[in-house]
Protein backbone atom coordinates (compact mmCIF):
# COMPACT_ATOMS: atom_id res chain seq x y z
CA UNK A 1 0.00 0.00 0.00
CA UNK A 2 1.23 3.50 -0.82
CA UNK A 3 2.09 5.80 2.03
CA UNK A 4 0.41 9.20 1.78
CA UNK A 5 3.73 10.97 1.30
CA UNK A 6 4.71 8.64 -1.58
CA UNK A 7 1.47 9.25 -3.43
CA UNK A 8 1.73 13.06 -3.28
CA UNK A 9 4.70 13.53 -5.60
CA UNK A 10 2.42 15.25 -8.14
CA UNK A 11 1.68 18.08 -5.67
CA UNK A 12 3.55 21.38 -5.69
CA UNK A 13 5.96 20.93 -2.72
CA UNK A 14 5.72 24.64 -1.79
CA UNK A 15 2.26 25.95 -2.72
CA UNK A 16 2.19 29.75 -2.24
CA UNK A 17 5.61 29.43 -0.58
CA UNK A 18 4.25 27.22 2.23
CA UNK A 19 5.79 23.75 2.72
CA UNK A 20 3.22 20.97 2.12
CA UNK A 21 4.09 19.53 5.54
CA UNK A 22 2.61 22.64 7.20
CA UNK A 23 -0.80 22.27 5.53
CA UNK A 24 -1.95 19.22 7.53
CA UNK A 25 -3.56 17.71 4.44
CA UNK A 26 -4.46 14.52 6.32
CA UNK A 27 -6.79 16.58 8.53
CA UNK A 28 -8.50 18.30 5.59
CA UNK A 29 -11.73 16.48 4.76
CA UNK A 30 -12.01 17.67 1.15
CA UNK A 31 -8.40 16.74 0.37
CA UNK A 32 -8.68 13.36 2.12
CA UNK A 33 -11.83 12.49 0.17
CA UNK A 34 -10.14 13.27 -3.15
CA UNK A 35 -6.99 11.40 -2.11
CA UNK A 36 -9.01 8.31 -1.15
CA UNK A 37 -10.89 8.36 -4.49
CA UNK A 38 -7.56 8.71 -6.34
CA UNK A 39 -6.07 5.79 -4.38
CA UNK A 40 -9.07 3.57 -5.24
CA UNK A 41 -8.95 4.49 -8.93
CA UNK A 42 -5.22 3.68 -9.09
CA UNK A 43 -5.74 0.31 -7.36
CA UNK A 44 -8.72 -0.50 -9.58
CA UNK A 45 -7.27 0.36 -13.03
CA UNK A 46 -4.60 3.06 -13.28
CA UNK A 47 -4.64 3.22 -17.10
CA UNK A 48 -8.38 2.96 -17.55
CA UNK A 49 -8.96 5.65 -14.93
CA UNK A 50 -6.08 7.89 -16.07
CA UNK A 51 -8.31 10.83 -17.06
CA UNK A 52 -10.19 10.90 -13.75
CA UNK A 53 -6.94 10.41 -11.79
CA UNK A 54 -5.38 13.39 -13.61
CA UNK A 55 -8.49 15.50 -12.88
CA UNK A 56 -8.27 14.60 -9.19
CA UNK A 57 -4.57 15.45 -9.09
CA UNK A 58 -5.27 18.90 -10.56
CA UNK A 59 -8.09 19.45 -8.05
CA UNK A 60 -5.92 18.26 -5.15
CA UNK A 61 -3.10 20.59 -6.22
CA UNK A 62 -5.53 23.52 -6.52
CA UNK A 63 -6.95 22.73 -3.08
CA UNK A 64 -3.46 22.61 -1.54
CA UNK A 65 -2.87 26.09 -3.00
CA UNK A 66 -6.15 27.33 -1.47
CA UNK A 67 -5.12 25.96 1.93
CA UNK A 68 -1.66 27.49 1.56
CA UNK A 69 -3.14 30.90 0.73
CA UNK A 70 -5.18 30.75 3.93
CA UNK A 71 -2.13 29.68 5.93
CA UNK A 72 0.06 32.35 4.34
CA UNK A 73 -2.50 35.09 5.00
CA UNK A 74 -2.79 33.93 8.63
CA UNK A 75 0.97 33.90 8.99
CA UNK A 76 1.15 37.42 7.56
CA UNK A 77 -1.45 38.99 9.82
CA UNK A 78 1.28 41.13 11.43
CA UNK A 79 1.92 42.89 8.09
CA UNK A 80 0.32 46.20 7.19
CA UNK A 81 -2.47 45.09 4.80
CA UNK A 82 -2.07 48.24 2.66
CA UNK A 83 1.58 49.36 2.70
CA UNK A 84 1.83 52.76 1.00
CA UNK A 85 -1.82 52.29 -0.05
CA UNK A 86 -1.01 49.17 -2.10
CA UNK A 87 -2.84 45.91 -1.21
CA UNK A 88 -0.44 43.18 -0.04
CA UNK A 89 -1.89 40.85 -2.67
CA UNK A 90 -0.44 43.09 -5.41
CA UNK A 91 3.11 42.87 -4.09
CA UNK A 92 3.73 39.21 -5.03
CA UNK A 93 5.64 38.63 -1.79
CA UNK A 94 6.11 34.92 -2.58
CA UNK A 95 8.22 35.88 -5.60
CA UNK A 96 10.42 38.30 -3.65
CA UNK A 97 13.61 36.50 -2.60
CA UNK A 98 14.43 38.79 0.34
CA UNK A 99 10.90 38.56 1.77
CA UNK A 100 10.72 34.78 1.23
CA UNK A 101 14.05 34.27 3.01
CA UNK A 102 12.88 36.27 6.04
CA UNK A 103 9.51 34.51 6.04
CA UNK A 104 11.16 31.08 5.96
CA UNK A 105 13.48 32.03 8.85
CA UNK A 106 10.47 33.32 10.83
CA UNK A 107 8.55 30.09 10.14
CA UNK A 108 11.48 27.96 11.34
CA UNK A 109 11.96 30.04 14.50
CA UNK A 110 8.26 29.74 15.36
CA UNK A 111 8.30 25.97 14.79
CA UNK A 112 11.50 25.61 16.82
CA UNK A 113 10.61 27.70 19.90
CA UNK A 114 8.19 30.59 19.54
CA UNK A 115 8.78 32.01 23.04
CA UNK A 116 12.53 31.48 23.13
CA UNK A 117 12.92 33.08 19.71
CA UNK A 118 10.40 35.87 20.33
CA UNK A 119 12.93 38.72 20.03
CA UNK A 120 14.31 37.50 16.68
CA UNK A 121 10.79 36.77 15.40
CA UNK A 122 9.75 40.34 16.28
CA UNK A 123 12.85 41.72 14.49
CA UNK A 124 11.97 39.71 11.39
CA UNK A 125 8.36 40.90 11.47
CA UNK A 126 9.52 44.53 11.59
CA UNK A 127 11.98 43.90 8.74
CA UNK A 128 9.31 42.09 6.68
CA UNK A 129 6.89 44.97 7.20
CA UNK A 130 9.55 47.51 6.22
CA UNK A 131 10.40 45.46 3.13
CA UNK A 132 6.73 45.22 2.11
CA UNK A 133 6.60 49.05 2.33
CA UNK A 134 9.72 49.31 0.13
CA UNK A 135 8.13 46.99 -2.44
CA UNK A 136 4.89 48.98 -2.30
CA UNK A 137 6.77 52.26 -2.91
CA UNK A 138 8.43 50.71 -5.96
CA UNK A 139 5.10 49.39 -7.22
CA UNK A 140 3.39 52.76 -6.66
CA UNK A 141 6.17 54.65 -8.47
CA UNK A 142 6.13 52.12 -11.33
CA UNK A 143 2.39 52.48 -11.82
CA UNK A 144 2.63 56.30 -11.69
CA UNK A 145 5.36 56.34 -14.34
CA UNK A 146 3.01 54.61 -16.79
CA UNK A 147 0.27 57.17 -16.32
CA UNK A 148 0.37 60.29 -18.49
Curated annotation (Swiss-Prot):
Highest taxon in the source lineage: Eukaryota
Identify the GO cellular component terms for this protein: cytoplasm; cytoskeleton
- Where found, per UniProt? Cytoplasm, Cytoskeleton
Q: Which cysteines are joined by disulfide bonds?
A: none
A UniProt-annotated Pfam family: DUF7623
Name residues in a coiled coil.
Answer: none
Keywords recorded for this protein, A-Z: Cytoplasm, Cytoskeleton, Repeat
Region feature (Disordered) = 1-22
Tell me where the sequence repeats sit in this chain. Answer: 1-68, 69-136, 137-148
Name used for this protein in its record: Antigen GM6
Query: From what organism does this protein derive?
Result: Trypanosoma brucei gambiense
List the taxonomic lineage. Answer: Eukaryota, Discoba, Euglenozoa, Kinetoplastea, Metakinetoplastina
Amino acid sequence: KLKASDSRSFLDPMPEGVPLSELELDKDEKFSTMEEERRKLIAEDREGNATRIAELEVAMNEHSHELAKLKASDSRSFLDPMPEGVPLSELELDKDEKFSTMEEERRKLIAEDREGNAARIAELEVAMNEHSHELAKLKASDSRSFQS
